[in-house]
Amino acid sequence: MTAKNAVLQLSIHEERTRKKALVTVSRFSGVTSITMDKSGKMTIVGEVDVPAVVMKLRKLCNTEIVSVDDVKPPVKKPEPEKPAESIAYPVPMNYAYQFNPAYANSYYHQPYGNCRVVDEPNCVIM
């Protein structure tokens, strides 16, 4: 079943009867929206059996079918194609190479105050 737009003319003179008519129509499955004027015109939109709705409403008040139309889906305008956006990906930052901590050179040397010159007795100059 396709969605229909039905306009009904109701002879309603009291607010209480108007509320009962709205509740009666809203109980049908497939009803999308219901609007009602003060003049008594009720507009029903949805996938609903219109003669069944009229039969229920005739138990409350005098009801006439004014028009029944198929609901046309709204025409979508084709959207202009957007140019592909260039996505700027973040540049991965390389961390500087982490060197091991430098250790102090630790070698032992004699202090300069203890140095002495040794004359070798083997050397003979004649």
From Swiss-Prot:
Any GO MF annotation of the entry: metal ion binding
Protein name: Heavy metal-associated isoprenylated plant protein 14
The keyword ATP-binding is annotated on this UniProt entry: no
Transmembrane segments: none
Family from the record: Belongs to the HIPP family.
Function, in words: Probable heavy-metal-binding protein.
Residues where lipid is bound covalently (S-farnesyl cysteine): C123
Keywords: Lipoprotein, Metal-binding, Methylation, Prenylation
Alphabetized InterPro entries for the sequence: HIPP (IPR051863), HMA_dom (IPR006121)
Source organism of this protein record: Arabidopsis thaliana (Mouse-ear cress)
Residue ranges annotated for the HMA domain, each copy included: 3-69
PROSITE patterns, per the entry: HMA_2
Propeptide: 124-126
Induction or repression: Up-regulated by cadmium.
Modified sites of kind Cysteine methyl ester: C123
Record carries keyword Lipoprotein: yes
